[in-house]
């Protein structure tokens, strides 16, 4: 499993280091542990840096691009003193929607609104996107899944309580 908490902390800490104080969180469904863990990492990073957790900047939708787009349009309607200067999206599809909404509003990324996603999907590195994102160690995840499968096939069993967390890495590109 990926350490979602750590990845979210890395993303928000990076935005804080860039000078952002009003950072929005856009997440997927509330009943999914991924959303809960990434939201927890977001709030912990804000608390660690003595920044308030503003509930009006925490938005939950789905993990789809459209959700990021519509939620960002609502956030951008806030007055200048309330509007976020950065958005941490709980996945890259949400972040793509955020980017679309910010660009359509004729705001500059990252000057007016910085955007950080999570997952490092293939589209994140395209020249026209260049999304700053938290990258999951896909190779290590696959290797671990394969070795676990081999262990099961050999009859070695699998410790049902065993939980391995892999650390993500922040990949800084142009949107952050």
Regions found by a protein language model. Name each.
Residues 1-176:
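Bacterial carbohydrate/catabolite-sensing allosteric modules
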């Amino acid at each position: 499993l990926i350490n979602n908490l750590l990845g979210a902390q890395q993303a928000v800490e990076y935005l804080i280091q860039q000078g952002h104080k009003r950072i929005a969180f856009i997440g997927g469904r509330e009943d999914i542990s991924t959303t809960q863990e990434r939201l927890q990492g977001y709030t912990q990073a804000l608390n660690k840096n003595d920044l308030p957790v503003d509930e009006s900047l925490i938005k939950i939708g789905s993990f789809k691009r459209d959700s990021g787009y519509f939620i960002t349009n609502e956030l951008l309607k806030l007055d200048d003193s309330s509007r976020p200067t950065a958005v941490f999206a709980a996945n890259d599809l949400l972040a793509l929607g955020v980017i679309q909404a910010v660009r359509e509003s004729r705001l500059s990324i990252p000057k007016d609104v910085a955007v950080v996603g999570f997952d490092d999907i293939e589209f994140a590195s395209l020249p026209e996107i260049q999304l700053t994102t938290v990258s999951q160690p896909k190779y290590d995840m696959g290797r671990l899944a394969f070795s676990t499968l081999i262990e099961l096939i050999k009859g070695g069993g699998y410790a049902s309580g065993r939980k391995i967390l892999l650390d993500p890495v922040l990949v800084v590109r142009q949107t952050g």
